[in-house]
Curated annotation (Swiss-Prot):
GO molecular function list: 4-hydroxybenzoate polyprenyltransferase activity
Protein name: 4-hydroxybenzoate octaprenyltransferase
Pathway the protein contributes to: Cofactor biosynthesis; ubiquinone biosynthesis
Transmembrane segments: 20-40, 43-63, 88-110, 114-131, 135-155, 166-186, 200-220, 265-285
Membrane topology reported for the UniProt record: Multi-pass membrane protein
Reactions catalysed, as given in the entry: all-trans-octaprenyl diphosphate + 4-hydroxybenzoate = 4-hydroxy-3-(all-trans-octaprenyl)benzoate + diphosphate
Family named by the database record: Belongs to the UbiA prenyltransferase family.
Record-linked Gene3D superfamilies: UbiA prenyltransferase
Annotated organism of origin: Francisella philomiragia subsp. philomiragia (strain ATCC 25017 / CCUG 19701 / FSC 153 / O#319-036)
Length: 285
């Protein structure tokens, strides 16, 4: 029984019981693979990048819980996490984090030297984000850089370069990430204000909804720019319009505030990532 409890604690530490953030990282990465391949990517890249996304997401979660262990106990949503509640020790977490990092590095060894070098930047960003909440006003920006860095790695792995379309798509996904993680941060804003944690939801204050709209809008404009640059057909732009309607639908959900509404609005963003992925695949059929 004790082993079963500890196993569940490890699952919670790695957030494997909540797969939506994995999808939020995976869809842009897979989309970048399709863009770089000008069609369906080689199975090797699909396997390596999918494993890499899952593993690095879990590494980020573990580092986050280690960094926030003294803060999480004051936040209603996080005070039952394995490290905060004592179900696992920091030593347990560090060993797991090291093992997962080694797995990620083994995966990247199947790629070219350029991508291997970029993987160190990806690791740095993943580790940096949890600590930014102490000193950086918009840690969601760092999260956007980290979550979507797989875009650069996808292009470097296949094309051995980072072309203009990669930059356009990367900037679009960063804006998208800032928007949806600001929604997520709304769930904890009152607690963050009390304990001095920084977030875009805290920084934007009463204008937070306007800023979420702004970042979503910029994200869509950059997607349109990507479509124009790559000469995509009308189907792509119809999908962008559908994404805009989903952003509007989410607005009426997260505007109600409350943990449940904010988490639901945050989670629903993965459908937008899926839509863009499907639209890009269609362009190369």
């Amino acid at each position: 029984m004790q082993n079963n409890t500890k196993f569940k604690a490890y699952i919670m530490l790695m957030r494997l019981h909540r797969p939506i953030p994995i999808l939020l990282i995976l869809w842009p990465t897979l989309t970048a693979l399709v863009l770089a391949s000008h069609g369906i990517p080689d199975i090797k890249y699909l396997i390596v990048f999918t494993i890499g996304v899952v593993v690095m997401r879990t590494v980020g979660c573990i580092v986050n819980d280690i960094a926030d262990i003294d803060f999480d106990k004051y936040v209603e949503r996080t005070n039952t996490r394995p490290l905060t509640s004592g179900k696992l020790s920091v030593k347990n977490a560090l060993y797991l984090c090291l093992a997962l990092t080694i797995i990620a590095f083994i995966c990247v060894l199947f790629l070219n030297l350029y991508t291997i070098l970029l993987s160190f930047v990806a690791l740095f960003l993943a580790v940096l984000y949890p600590f930014c909440k102490r000193f950086f006003a918009i840690p969601q920006l760092i999260l956007g850089l980290a979550f979507n860095f797989g875009i650069f790695m996808a292009f470097s792995a296949i094309e051995n370069q980072i072309p203009l379309e990669a930059w356009i798509f990367y900037l679009s996904t960063i804006c998208w990430t800032i928007a949806y993680d600001t929604i997520y941060a709304l769930a904890d804003r009152d607690f963050d204000l009390e304990i001095g944690i920084k977030s875009s939801a805290v920084l934007f204050g009463d204008k937070v909804f306007k800023y979420i709209f702004l970042f979503n809008f910029i994200s869509l404009i950059l997607l349109i720019a990507l479509g124009i640059y790559l000469s995509f057909n009308i189907i792509f732009y119809i999908g962008v319009i559908i994404s805009a309607f989903l952003f509007i639908r989410n607005y009426f959900l997260y505007k109600k505030l409350g943990i449940t509404n904010c988490i639901k609005a945050f989670s629903d963003n993965h459908w937008i990532g899926l839509i863009i992925f499907i639209l890009v695949v269609i362009q190369y059929l």
